[in-house]
């Protein structure tokens, strides 16, 4: 990026300046005020109070001053470095804290983290956890198959014959419009009592199972009642499973009929709108019910497909896409005389969330025109499936065709591409109400091992876009025991409130024989699932021995993370899994791509890499060294990794002496414990303790004062070696309490902070202690009480020297308006401890600078004052250099941190901008610093962000969702007997039932969490120091408006010292660099699919079985017209029944949530 050059009208007195380093203009600067070297330099702060008493120099005129020479500014930089270093040496207490640790060497041991042993142990623990769930799954699946095989079908079964707990009963009883209220309460409905269980985050009943039946399925049908009858026997198996493994969470059987039976019983979490949950559309069910798919969807957009039929097709395609998972590949094309893709994707792409979003948006743009050309559509689809040069599922291959009907059977196309092996299944969908002969569509499906469906109206879409899974399940069922393999899902949001979970799935087969010929049944009964909460897996990983910047992560075969500290979705969608790629969870580079590939391949490995990491507050980038170690988790598709910085190879473990442990008194009686009591804060400083799980009975609280109170109360009852407490955490906390108290005693208490313009001094430790001195400074302490979650703590560990952290500009008040409050800048540094040959960083210490006072001191330190208090004399006959104090109207002097945020300025009007990105303060100068490589930037995407919902468009004149007849239609007798009339009535019927499919509930839009925020992508930009380390002079070239500037890194800090001429005119304004997070559509998906990330599909595939019976290949799904209903609706319309609000097809996907 080049610095933009512009010519301005203003003139500049003096010589023309060029864009090159210069020896300086005017006289040399004052002699080095440090004098001869006579010992270590003292902090200049000791000299500042008398300097501040001197009268300010009066500028004798612009002609008397020149821009400072380079070595003058280097001298100022050295003064700043010495001042910072001197203050930190006196108050930071780094050396003193080292001595304190060594003096207390008998109170702790140094333990080593051995990456290979650690990762193998954790992988083994996770394997054991999941294996227990696998055994429970197998018991359930075997029992279900046996129960169903022994069940005798009952044609005359009635609702009152079946007793079960309807999970939605409580919600339906509260809803006067519910199905049960309309038909009256049933004696078959059990009423249960529930108890709160924190493991389920819900009220549960351990004696019963609960049943959930989708709203669009009649629970009194013979099929459903028989299903309820035989699945009741699963209750005892669920209970026995829990007896054998009390850690089991939800055990679920999802039936192919749509019935869900789960244990333990709990009321269904039904939304305020209509409940459209269907287990068959859940990610875990889809994965368990069939093998991966390569699917091409072709949509007839000929001229006959228009209005309602086209809208039904668009909705159907979107629903079909929702039945696909990340193991599947898909493309969508429209056809008339020619076929073309609806989106920018020219080949099969992975059916992930972002790709499906592209398809769904593109489908809405389809327009009907031309004539029907089945041949073009099918040839395009077969060519897509035969393309072997792309990544794909390489398992089930299928074509899904949506049309309103036609006569052509395109037999020649099938003969060319698919016969005789018939490796591609063809599913045909007749959409809308029409009078076309459907025989050709049925023939296409039946001769290509597929199925024919009818979608006459909106109510038939959901069921008919998911039942193809039954056909795909046939080879799996016929494979028998070979297909009985447990699969583990991606991470997704549990529908019953557990949070993020993974689910182990196992298909359940129908073992009955069909008819007297003893032909084997080939239908899948359903899928058995057992949930495992991510929190339960996290508990198996080491939390605090890895240090603040060490962590464990796990990924699956798609490269999606199962565990990762950055897996923190702010919103979740029940319909989609949570898919965060490892390369999106971290900042991507080539080394991480290699690690990811090796993990997906199931290899072991270790690699030390230099990489970039984003700070916890997402404002900074650090270049760090990390050690990655990884192993596969056996019997699963997961791989586990461990990340350690070199300084976390060792950690401290408190070793409270036998004498202390032998005193069987509460912990509160220990000597060091008294320094946790609030009564000691006034003299010893305020103590924040990390809200960790020290003991099982400790009540958590977001308020640290409340948490400390709970902790102290519990410690009154607990001995140091109590079995209910985590001794490692508890002992380390007490150890660090005593060590930080000694820092107060040896260093802080005897120092006068006000003399050095300090608001506070502090220390934070790995053991979870943050001590802030003096006590009153705690009132303005805003850092996280958990050091591992505090940005200053983690950044200090990763960097050498002093790390400045200005306050975030959103929380900053104008200093001149401050009354009793003051604004501070944190300066922190890690304490590196060497014990023998072992080095570690167990703590971070620092100070909090008074911003207003230090802004004044900054000006003096960057001035031409001498130690002899002799200001430089300038007059008409002599020249001297400008400085940051006297010439602040002409000279801009700033300290900027490594993220580009303003820390200090010599401009009083900029004090309220401290903490802002410098481009917002001086865009021209920041761009020059970037162009001259003082800064570089990193752009990335946050795929887990939450955004406010977009205001709905065209509310006043939304397009109609259904055909509305005109007066002429009502007067035309032929119209009343046409298919169009019946289609309208069917739409109205379904509109009465499924109104929420088309139109969002106004009440929900006002207050529901689902409508307040939605998942979105945010683009993030962070800046960090570039390759320039030396002192550097440059010019911002803008003709007569050009500006000179000097920039230099301050040694042992994260600061850049910049001195520049203030801009003379505004015409030189350049483009502004942006740092603020912005809403984005993410990277261009059309480009990303051309270079897909490496992945592997499941190891098993069941797409063919020679014994498969394909004769069952199609049926209509519309219900026959009822003369009574038809006549009634006609009368109501003729009598002027007020119309319901028109349903909006375009909001169908947005207004319902599974």
UniProtKB/Swiss-Prot annotation:
The chain crosses the membrane at residues 1117-1137. It is found in: Membrane. Residues 294-472 form the VWFA domain. It is linked to Defects in Cacna2d2 are the cause of ducky phenotype (du). Du mice have spike-wave seizures characteristic of absence epilepsy and ataxia, with accompanying decreased calcium channel current in cerebellar Purkinje cells. Disulfide bonds join 446-1101. Its main location: membrane. One of its GO terms (molecular function) is metal ion binding. Glycans are attached at residues 205, 389, 421, 510, 543, 627, 864. This is Voltage-dependent calcium channel subunit alpha-2/delta-2. The gene is Cacna2d2. GO terms for cellular component: GABA-ergic synapse; plasma membrane; presynaptic active zone membrane; voltage-gated calcium channel complex. It comes from Mus musculus (Mouse). Residues 1-37 are annotated as: Disordered. Residues 24-34 have a biased composition (Pro residues).
């Amino acid at each position: 990026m080049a610095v933009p050059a512009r010519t301005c009208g203003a003139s500049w007195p003096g010589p023309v300046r060029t864009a090159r380093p210069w020896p300086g203009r005017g006289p040399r600067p004052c002699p080095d005020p440090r004098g001869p070297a006579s010992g270590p330099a003292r902090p200049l702060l000791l000299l500042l109070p008398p300097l501040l008493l001197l009268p300010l120099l009066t500028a004798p005129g612009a002609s008397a001053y020149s821009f400072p020479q380079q070595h003058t500014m280097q001298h100022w930089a050295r003064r700043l470095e010495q001042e910072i270093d001197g203050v930190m040496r006196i108050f930071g207490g780094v050396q003193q804290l080292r001595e304190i640790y060594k003096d207390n060497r008998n109170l702790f041991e140094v333990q080593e983290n051995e990456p290979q042993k650690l990762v193998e142990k954790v992988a083994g623990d996770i394997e054991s956890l999941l294996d227990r769930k696998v055994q429970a799954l197998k018991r359930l699946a075997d029992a279900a198959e046996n129960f169903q095989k022994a069940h005798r079908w009952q044609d005359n079964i009635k609702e009152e014959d079946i007793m079960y707990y309807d999970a939605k009963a409580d919600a339906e009883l509260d809803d006067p419009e519910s199905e049960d209220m309309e038909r009256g309460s049933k004696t078959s409905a059990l009423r249960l009592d529930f108890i709160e269980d924190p493991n389920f985050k819900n009220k549960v009943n351990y004696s019963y199972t609960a049943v959930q039946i989708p709203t669009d399925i009649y629970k009194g049908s013979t099929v459903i009642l028989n299903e309820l009858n035989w699945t009741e026997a699963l209750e005892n198996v669920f209970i026995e499973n829990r007896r054998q493994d009390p850690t089991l969470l939800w055990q679920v059987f999802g039936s192919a009929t749509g019935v869900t039976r789960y244990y333990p019983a709990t009321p269904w979490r039904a939304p305020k709108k209509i409940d459209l949950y269907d287990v068959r559309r859940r990610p875990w069910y889809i994965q368990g019910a069939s093998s991966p798919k390569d699917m091409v969807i072709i949509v007839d957009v000929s001229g006959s497909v228009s209005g309602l039929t086209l809208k039904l097709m668009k909705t159907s395609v979107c629903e079909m896409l929702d039945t696909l998972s990340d193991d599947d590949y898909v493309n969508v094309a429209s056809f008339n005389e020619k076929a073309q893709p609806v989106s920018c994707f020219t080949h099969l792409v992975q059916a992930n969330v972002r790709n499906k979003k592209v398809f769904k948006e593109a489908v809405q743009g389809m327009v009907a025109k031309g004539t029907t050309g089945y041949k073009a559509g099918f040839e395009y689809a077969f060519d897509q499936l035969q393309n072997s040069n792309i990544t794909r599922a390489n398992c089930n291959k299928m074509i899904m065709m949506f049309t309103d009907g036609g006569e052509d059977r395109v037999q020649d196309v099938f003969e060319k591409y698919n016969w005789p092996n018939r490796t591609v299944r063809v599913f045909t969908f007749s959409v809308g109400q029409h009078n076309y002969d459907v025989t050709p569509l049925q023939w296409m499906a039946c001769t290509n091992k597929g199925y024919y469906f009818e979608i006459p109206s909106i109510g038939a879409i959901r069921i008919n876009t998911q039942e193809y899974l039954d056909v795909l399940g046939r080879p799996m069922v016929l494979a028998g025991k070979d297909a009985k393999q447990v699969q583990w899902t991606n991470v997704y949001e549990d529908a019953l409130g557990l949070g993020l979970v993974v689910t182990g799935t196992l298909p359940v087969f129908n073992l009955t024989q069909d008819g007297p010929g003893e032909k084997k049944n080939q239908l899948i009964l359903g899928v058995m699932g057992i949930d495992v909460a991510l929190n339960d897996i996290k508990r198996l990983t080491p939390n605090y021995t890895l240090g603040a910047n060490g962590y464990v992560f796990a990924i699956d075969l798609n490269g999606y993370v199962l565990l990762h500290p950055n897996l923190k979705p702010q919103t979740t969608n029940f319909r989609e899994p949570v898919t965060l790629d490892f390369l999106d969870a971290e900042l991507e580079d080539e080394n991480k791509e290699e690690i990811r590939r090796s993990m997906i391949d199931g290899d072991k490995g270790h690699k030390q890499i230099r990489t970039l990491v984003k700070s916890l507050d997402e404002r900074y980038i650090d270049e760090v060294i990390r050690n990655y170690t990884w192993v596969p988790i056996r019997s699963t598709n997961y791989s586990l990794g461990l990340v350690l910085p070199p300084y976390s190879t060792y950690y401290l473990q408190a070793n409270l002496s036998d004498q202390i442990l032998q005193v069987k008194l509460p912990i509160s009686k220990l000597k060091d414990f008294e320094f946790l009591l609030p009564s000691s804060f006034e003299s010893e400083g305020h103590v924040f303790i990390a809200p960790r799980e020290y003991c099982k009975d400790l009540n958590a609280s977001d308020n640290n004062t409340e948490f400390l109170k709970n902790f102290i109360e519990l410690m009154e009852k607990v001995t140091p070696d109590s079995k209910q407490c985590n001794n490692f955490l508890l002992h380390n906390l007490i150890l660090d309490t005593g060590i930080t108290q000694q820092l107060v005693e040896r260093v802080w208490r005897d120092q006068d902070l006000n003399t050095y313009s300090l608001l506070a001094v502090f220390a934070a430790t790995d053991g979870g202690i943050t001590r802030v001195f003096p006590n009153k400074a705690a009132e303005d302490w805003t850092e996280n009480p958990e050091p591992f979650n505090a940005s200053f703590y983690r950044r200090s560990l990763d960097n050498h020297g002093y790390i400045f952290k200005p306050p975030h500009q959103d929380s900053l008040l104008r200093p001149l308006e401050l009354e009793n409050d003051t604004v501070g800048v944190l300066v922190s540094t890690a304490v590196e401890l060497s014990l023998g040959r072992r080095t570690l960083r167990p703590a971070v210490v620092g100070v909090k600078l008074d911003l207003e006072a230090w802004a004044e001191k900054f000006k003096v330190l960057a001035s031409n004052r001498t130690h002899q208090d002799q200001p430089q004399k300038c007059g008409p006959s002599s020249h001297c250099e400008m400085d940051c104090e006297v010439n602040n109207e002409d000279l801009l002097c700033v300290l900027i941190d490594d993220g580009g945020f303003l820390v200090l300025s010599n401009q009083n009007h900029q004090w309220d901008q401290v903490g802002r990105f410098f481009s917002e303060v001086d865009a021209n100068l920041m761009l020059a610093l970037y162009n001259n490589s003082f800064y570089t930037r990193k752009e990335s995407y946050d795929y887990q962000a939450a955004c406010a919902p977009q205001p709905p468009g065209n509310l006043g004149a939304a397009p109609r969702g259904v055909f509305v007849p005109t007066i002429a239609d009502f007067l035309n007798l032929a119209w009343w007997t046409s298919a169009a009339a019946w289609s309208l009535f069917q739409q109205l019927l379904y509109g009465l039932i499924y109104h929420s499919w088309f139109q969002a509930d106004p009440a929900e839009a006002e207050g529901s969490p689902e409508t307040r925020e939605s998942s979105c992508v945010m683009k993030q930009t962070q800046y960090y120091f570039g390759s320039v380390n030396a002192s550097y002079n440059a010019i911002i070239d803008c003709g007569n408006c050009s500006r000179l500037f000097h920039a230099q890194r301050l040694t042992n800090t994260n600061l850049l010292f910049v001195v520049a001429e203030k801009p003379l005119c505004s015409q030189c304004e350049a483009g502004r660099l942006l740092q603020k997070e912005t809403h984005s559509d993410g990277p261009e998906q059309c480009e990303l699919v051309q270079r897909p990330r490496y992945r592997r599909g499941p190891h098993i595939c069941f797409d063919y079985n020679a014994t498969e019976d394909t004769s069952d290949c199609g049926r209509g799904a519309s219900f026959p017209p009822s003369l009574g209903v038809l006549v009634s609706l006609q009368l109501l319309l003729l009598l002027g029944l007020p119309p319901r609000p028109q349903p909006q097809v375009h909001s169908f996907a947005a207004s319902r949530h599974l």
